[in-house]
Regions:
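N-proximal short alpha-helices
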Residues: 105, 141, 239-247
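Polar/charged low-complexity regulatory segments
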Residues: 223-245
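Ordered core of a single globular domain
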Residues: 248, 252-301, 396, 400-403
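Short, small-residue-biased leader/transition segments that mark boundaries at the very start
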Residues: 1-2, 298, 305-460
């Protein structure tokens, strides 16, 4: 295998290997693990005398690491947690941030932590820290986070964050706007507040339906870890200077993103009201709140349809472009669909929705029908005067299992059929004007927000103990 690589690419000095990544070794003894480290090191050195082994710290083991000379190993500490725990045992370490899992779409990220200059702090504590890195699983979300993170290694100390954000807004939008600067202060107090690094919160939109929705993906759960009106105030400020800033493509991206966050946050409370109405057997209230929730999903799809960055249709068309024959193109579409839905090839996946995305096309074609089927099922129970019980169902990573009961089994068959369906992409991949659609939906959901947030009490201390989660260890 390594010789075949040499024929294709030649030797290039740097080689990656992560033994037992997110898994357990067959023999977990110091002697065995030391042997693993020595064997891999010898393989690399035999192939390339100057080889540098690059290893992720995610699942690294001390005995494997210490079997390799320090000059022959570079550790990538994806989220900085291992460096904080053991200093990398004196080995060269790149200490970084793992800000996004699976390409999930959610505004978050501890900007104050970045502005404090993590690299310089880590370097001062551990001289073996030799670099800073970003190890996100996907991009095209939270551009402010990445802009600041990539800038910080150029600074010798911390920076004044509020001043940086004001300059960022002007630089990003290409014009001075006090309102835009104020908007970013609200966002700093809200989704970019302290403690919001690591795993993004779940999405009610992308969650597999349940009365008590716990998670969308297999990691962090639902919840809004800040006062949700802060996002609404930010959007109000961004729209104030729309006539001045509408020429700016980054501005148009941001107003869509903030509107998306405003609506997905609100969706958590709307569905909660629908679930409460079902529990109390209030048919009128159930119809009102479930109807509003489904309408919110349709509106989100329309909103996100205005930007190619939020286009499932673009994703599918680009995937199909890699195929030469119809069979290859269909396979590429199936795999691209599977990645953002069931996350696997079998009929009973456990890490389904790992890579959920709030995307146009995926909402309209996948998430919305799931919720429609669920609410229709609940309505049937209301009409028949029967109960629907979720308590005691088998769970997979804190959510109802893929086939936890009859409803989920039927839903699973529909989901698997959706993955196999071809020709799903809509053309063109975008439709509508971002500013026109955003303004209309802001006015519409501002009114509903005032109603649903009237008694909101969901903001509390952010719990950090599950900030980073390894889905390989349940």
């Amino acid at each position: 295998c390594i010789r075949d690589r040499d024929k294709l690419f030649g030797s290039y000095g740097v080689y990656a290997a992560d033994p037992f990544h997110e898994s357990a070794p067959p023999i977990d003894t110091p002697e065995y693990l030391t042997g693993v480290g020595q064997t891999i090191h010898k393989l690399f050195q035999t192939f390339d005398a100057g080889a540098l082994w690059v290893m992720q710290a995610w699942s690294m083991r001390e005995d494997i690491v210490k079997a390799v000379p320090k000059e022959s190993l570079l550790i990538l500490d994806l989220n900085g947690s291992k460096t904080a725990a053991n200093g990398g045992w004196g080995y060269p370490v790149i200490a970084g941030n793992l800000h996004n899992f699976g390409g999930r779409i959610n505004m978050h990220g501890d900007l104050a932590l970045l502005a404090s200059n993590q690299y310089q702090k880590a370097k001062a504590r551990y001289p073996n820290v030799c670099g800073s890195g970003l190890f996100m699983e996907a991009i095209e979300q939270n551009p402010v986070y990445y802009e600041l993170a990539f800038e910080m290694p150029n600074h010798a100390d911390s920076i004044p964050l509020q001043a940086w954000l004001a300059a960022y807004a002007e630089r990003r939008y290409g014009a001075k706007s006090a309102a835009a600067g104020k908007a970013w202060m609200y966002l700093l107090e809200g989704p970019y507040r302290r403690g919001t690094n690591g795993t993004e919160r779940s999405s009610i939109v992308a969650a597999r339906p349940a009365l008590n929705v716990k998670k969308s993906g297999p990691n962090a759960g639902l919840g809004i870890p800040y006062e949700p009106m802060l996002v609404i105030r930010a959007q109000s400020q961004l729209l104030k200077d729309a006539d001045k800033l509408a020429f700016s493509k980054p501005y148009r991206f941001d107003i869509v993103d903030v509107q998306r966050q405003m609506m997905t946050n609100l969706g958590q409370l709307v569905h909660k009201k629908a679930a409460e109405a079902f529990a109390s057997k209030d048919k009128a209230a159930f119809a009102l709140h479930s109807g509003r929730f489904l309408e919110l999903l349709r509106d989100m799809d329309e909103l996100l349809y205005t930007r190619s960055e939020y286009s499932f249709d673009r994703w599918l068309m680009e995937a199909r472009s890699w195929g030469e024959t119809k069979e290859e193109k269909d396979l590429m579409e199936r795999d691209a669909t599977s990645l953002v839905t069931i996350w696997g090839a079998d009929g009973d996946p456990r890490i389904f929705d790992y890579s959920w995305r709030e995307w146009a096309g995926l909402i309209n074609g996948y998430y919305l029908p799931r919720w429609q089927k669920f609410y229709t099922m609940l309505q049937g129970h209301l009409d028949a005067g029967t109960d629907y019980q979720e308590e005691g169902l088998s769970l997979a990573y804190g959510r109802e299992d893929f086939r936890a009961n009859d409803f989920y089994n039927r839903l699973a068959e529909w989901e698997l059929a959706y993955v196999d369906q071809t020709g799903k992409a809509r053309t063109p991949v975008t439709h509508g004007d971002e500013l026109v659609v955003t303004r209309r939906l802001f006015d519409k959901y501002l009114k509903l927000s005032r109603e649903y947030y009237a008694d909101f009490s969901g903001v509390g201390e952010i719990k950090e103990e599950r900030t980073y989660e390894n889905v390989g260890e349940e």
